[in-house]
From Swiss-Prot:
Organism, scientific name: Drosophila melanogaster (Fruit fly)
Impact reported for residue 320 to K: Defective spermatogenesis
Keywords per UniProt: Cytoplasm, Endonuclease, Hydrolase, Nuclease, Nucleus, Repeat, RNA-binding, RNA-mediated gene silencing
CDD domains xref list: SNc, Tudor_TDRD11
Comp. bias intervals (Low complexity): 1-17
Free-text note regarding domains: Tudor domain specifically binds peptides with symmetrically dimethylated arginines (sDMA) and may facilitate protein-protein interactions.
Region named Involved in dimethylarginine binding: 760-788
Gene3D superfamilies named in the record: 2.30.30.140, 2.40.50.90
Role of this protein: Endonuclease which shows activity towards both DNA and RNA substrates. Has a role in translation regulation throught its association with the with the RNA-induced silencing complex (RISC). Plays a role in spermatogenesis probably by negatively regulating piwi expression in the germline. Together with piwi, might be involved in transposon repression in the germline.
Name of the featured protein: Staphylococcal nuclease domain-containing protein 1
GO biological process: mRNA catabolic process; regulatory ncRNA-mediated gene silencing; spermatogenesis
GO CC terms, sorted: cytoplasm; cytosol; nucleus; RISC complex
Catalytic EC class: hydrolase
Length: 926
């Protein structure tokens, strides 16, 4: 008995003794697995050790399990998500103190967690979640003191109806409807439309791949972070992670992301899809996680996924550049490629003078030097038979091509690419910024590659966006690329998506061109008759062989033909050695003539009139007008770079040519440098003297006109009434053309004498105009179809399309015949006011009384109904003076004007009210 009593006493003492002390540790909560389980990591180490703690004495509702994750799909138990979220929001990233114990028959470690470093003062997390009614307390056996406290807290939660004990909450409402998979991932990307969506990161596979829930619809996605790639786990032959192989910085990158994103509230911007994975940007409180990884050297930029990013690619590149310069982590062995750039080569601006086949241009600098500029990181359309290397060069030659192979026309889309550049750039100012120098290789010289901009737009990007060029693909560590490479890739993706140009599904047919420079037989029979009938034919100058010999492309007939300028004889230019033919020296000023013609017409839109062919029938001969409306034959003659050929005598342009030649001779220009004018043996009779001898009678041929403008010198502009419908048609087409193809502001540099399009201030419509003066950023223009003048900023001027330059001006300037304005300013203003009231914007009848060389023709105006002569009426009202003229044919009209003036003087009208104003011109008043 005593022994039994002693034994009982000992047993009772053992039960009353406190439990064995458990070890207390501190750490940071990394992850919340459920309402009763957390993962805590140590505060030191990268990555640090971790411990999973399950709360003692409580049981949380089980979260849903995705299919394939170790079993079949299961649903949330009611309140499971709320329980998990309570802990997540309270604990993630928070330093805690915890105790744990591992029962002998369990693989789990159970314990308690307190917020902070001191469990005596810190919040007991297990008690807090019980108090909220989000877990159940285990009630088996004799409860310990801690367990009894939890039971009491649970009873209080039940009584208060908190959490899962709420009598009003529906259990079904506390179960998530999770979308574990997506049949059409791209559709989900389209739904969110690139807008940030709230999300929670649930798992970090590696530094650049995570799994997340998109809220509030609980789409479960695997997300590859846009624009970057972090080191990841190596896979074995079965495609499973091979943990035996350690990839440098893989664990560090994953840890970096876990500490900032795992189970944090973030925003995700979905941008694309790759297989079943989504591609997007993760935004957290400190910005874009991709940018942070790059700055730490834990990630590298990836071109293909940067292309899908909406914004921020420049920041990613800058972050990677920072890590490279600091040689951080992955870049610890990085060696920068620093090619030496001359400052003049690096950045410059100039005018484009020639476009090559889709990938290069010639730019003339302010000092006259011409530089060949290649576009960075793009390649033009190419022969599909060729194999292209990573740097854009053909590394496997295409099969041999024919003797007359012309890649511009025979390679699909090459002509479209060239035309895009030609229309956009020729004779326009561009900015060139050097990106890299491509080293020389077999058959390819060194290339200077630039980003070329016009009006702030990247030309290469515009080409790629239209499907007229493709991007060069580089090795990931190759920095020799365009400074706007990411924009180029993005533009290419859009072109592919839109099936534009090279990316269209239909077969890329070549441009069918009839090359009449090779096959001459069809010129006379098939083409010449229609060209001769046409007043003007639109063409493109493809090549200039000499000052007067060109090769033109006629789009209407899709043919190439050699074109010789009519009416002139031009010195022969020099020729380099080519294909075994020795070099040939040119005639004096032959090269200057070649340069003159190249600068004005090479790759420009021109209009031509073809008269005939040469003797061999291999070339056509005709007249060519530049895009500014100048006759090129006349321009060459006037510059002293050609002389008039005898064949021009029967041409309608002979007089213009002779006048131009006389001017060149007088100025001793170029070929006329040593010209000595012959002394005339007989007196030269002027045109007016000839006319006086032959014509003694005044010719009357009234034309119906509308006066559109009156100048302060009493000249006026008039339009023929018969041409009104043609003018309206021309203006409608011009306005429509500029509306559909608006010019780039500032891309055109006007020069005095240019025929341009000007945007009129009052209605902002475009009209034909001639530049009369350029001062700084302003230009004074004459609207040639109306006669009014205006001073405009040069950015309101644009090159006039060739289709609108061939028609003559619809407004003609005349001087009011036989009258002169008074010298007094007030009298002058009164005369102009009266004349304007009589004729401005009115339909009147006009008769040319005298043709004057170099000045407006003299004309009289009369009322079509009353037949009143407006000039004589102004004289009769004493507003203007009658002019004394000596032409015999005008004698009768001059006498009538004098009689009207005498009557006004006697009546003391207007300017005569104080007497005879002509007496002021007497010698005693001078």
């Amino acid at each position: 008995m005593a022994t039994a009593a002693n034994t009982a006493t000992a047993a009772g003492a053992a039960k009353d003794a406190p439990p064995a002390p458990t070890k207390s540790l501190s750490g940071i909560v990394k992850q919340v697995l459920s309402g009763d389980t957390v993962v805590i990591r140590a505060t030191k180490g990268a990555p640090p050790p971790e411990k999973q703690i399950t709360f003692s004495h409580v049981l949380a509702p089980k979260l849903a399990r995705r299919p394939g994750a170790g079993g079949d799909e299961t649903k949330d138990e009611p309140w499971a998500w709320e329980s998990r979220e309570f802990l997540r929001k309270k604990l993630i990233g928070v330093e805690v103190t915890f105790t744990f114990d591992k029962p002998a028959n369990s693989n789990r470690e159970y314990g308690f967690v307190w917020i902070g470093k001191d469990k005596e003062t810190g919040e007991n997390v297990v008690e807090s979640i019980v108090r909220e009614g989000l877990v159940s307390v285990r009630r088996e056996g004799r409860p310990t003191a801690e367990q009894q406290t939890l039971i009491e807290l649970e009873d209080q939660a039940r009584a208060a109806g908190r959490g899962k004990w709420s009598p009003t909450a529906s259990a079904a409402d506390k179960v998530r409807n999770i979308k574990w998979s997506h049949e059409n991932p791209a559709h989900l990307v389209d739904i969110y439309g690139g807008n940030p969506v709230k999300a929670i990161i649930e798992h970090v596979r590696d530094g650049s791949t995570v799994r997340a829930f998109l809220l509030p619809d609980f789409h479960y996605i695997t997300l590859m972070i846009s624009g970057i790639r972090c080191p990841g786990v190596k896979l074995d032959a079965d495609g499973k992670p091979d943990l035996s192989v350690k990839v440098p910085f893989a664990d560090e990158a994953r840890y970096y992301v876990e500490t900032r994103l795992l189970q944090r509230d973030v925003e995700i911007r979905l941008e694309s899809v790759n297989n079943s994975n989504f591609i997007g940007t993760i935004l957290y409180p400190k910005g874009n996680i991709a940018e942070s990884l790059l700055r730490e050297g834990l990630a590298k930029c990836v071109d293909w996924s940067m292309a899908v990013m909406k914004t921020g690619t420049d920041k990613l590149r800058a972050a990677e550049r920072f890590a490279k310069e600091k040689r951080l982590r992955q870049w610890q062995d990085y060696q920068a490629k620093t090619p030496a750039f001359n400052s003049k080569e690096k950045d410059f601006s100039g005018t484009v003078v020639e476009v090559f086949n889709g990938d290069a241009i010639n730019v003339r600098l302010s000092n006259g030097q011409v530089k060949k500029v290649f576009f960075s990181s793009i390649r033009p359309p190419r022969d599909q038979r060729a194999v292209v290397g990573t740097d854009g060069e053909e590394i496997v030659k295409a099969p041999p091509r024919g003797k007359n192979y012309r890649p511009l026309y025979e390679i699909p889309h090459m002509f479209d690419a060239r035309e895009f550049l030609r229309k956009k750039l020729i004779n326009k100012k561009v900015q060139c910024n050097l990106d890299y120098i491509s080293p020389p290789r077999e058959n390819f010289p060194e290339k200077y590659c630039y980003t070329v901009s016009i009006g702030g737009q990247n030309v290469a990007e515009a080409m790629v966006a239209k499907g007229l060029a493709t991007c060069v693909r580089y090795r990931q560590d190759d920095d020799q690329r365009s400074s706007a490479y990411d924009q180029l890739i993005a533009a290419e993706q859009q072109a592919i998506k839109g099936l534009k140009g090279l990316h269209a599904k239909k077969d890329n047919a070549t441009l069918r061109v009839n090359d009449l420079t090779v096959d001459h037989s069809r010129i006379k029979v098939q083409y010449l008759p229609s060209w001769q009938r046409a007043l003007r034919t639109e063409a493109i100058v493809e090549f200039v062989a000499s000052g007067s010999r060109l090769r033109i492309f006629v789009p209407k007939d899709s043919c190439l033909v050699t074109f010789l300028l009519a009416g002139i004889s031009c010195p022969r230019s020099s020729r380099p050695a080519l294909n075994g033919v020795p070099a040939q020296e040119g005639e004096p000023f032959g090269d200057e003539a070649l340069t003159f013609t190249r600068e004005r017409v090479l790759q420009r839109d021109v209009s031509v009139h073809i008269d005939t062919t040469d003797k061999a029938g291999s070339s056509v001969i005709g007249w060519l007008w530049t895009d500014s409306g100048a006759n090129l034959s006349v321009a060459l003659v006037e510059e002293g770079l050609a002389e008039v050929h005898f064949s021009a005598e029967k041409s309608e342009y002979y007089r213009q040519l002779k006048i131009a030649e006389d001017r060149a001779k007088a100025a001793k220009k170029n070929i006329w440098t040593n010209y000595v004018e012959e002394v005339p043996k007989e007196k030269t009779v002027t045109e007016e003297e000839k006319e006086d001898k032959v014509v003694a009678e005044r010719k009357v041929n009234y034309e119906n006109v509308i006066v559109t403008e009156i100048t302060e010198t009493l000249t006026f502009f008039a339009q023929s009434v018969e041409s009104g419908s043609k003018l309206e048609s021309l203006m409608s087409k011009l306005h429509a053309d500029f509306q559909s193809n608006p010019p780039i502001a500032g891309s055109y540099t006007p020069k005095r004498g240019d025929l341009v399009a000007a945007q009129f201030t009052l209605d902002n419509q475009w009209y034909r105009a001639k530049v009369e003066r350029v001062q700084g950023s302003n230009a004074t223009v004459l609207y040639i179809d109306y006669g009014n003048k205006e001073t405009l900023p040069t950015n309101r001027l644009a090159a006039l399309p060739p289709a609108f330059s061939s028609e003559k001006p619809y407004a003609t300037e005349y001087a009011l015949a036989l009258v002169a304005l008074p010298t007094d300013n007030e009298d002058k203003e009164e005369a102009l006011r009266a004349f304007s009231e009589d004729v401005l914007n009115h339909k009147v009848q006009l008769n040319v009384e005298l043709k004057v060389t170099g000045s407006p023709n003299l004309a009289t105006l009369r009322d079509p109904t009353t037949k009143v002569d407006f000039g004589k009426q102004l004289v009769a009202e004493g507003l203007v003076l009658a002019e004394q003229r000596g032409e015999r044919k005008l004698k009768e009209l001059v006498d009538q004007y004098k009689a009207a003036q005498e009557a006004a003087r006697v009546a003391h009208l207007a300017i005569w009210k104080y007497g005879d104003i002509t007496q002021d011109d007497a010698p005693e008043f001078r």
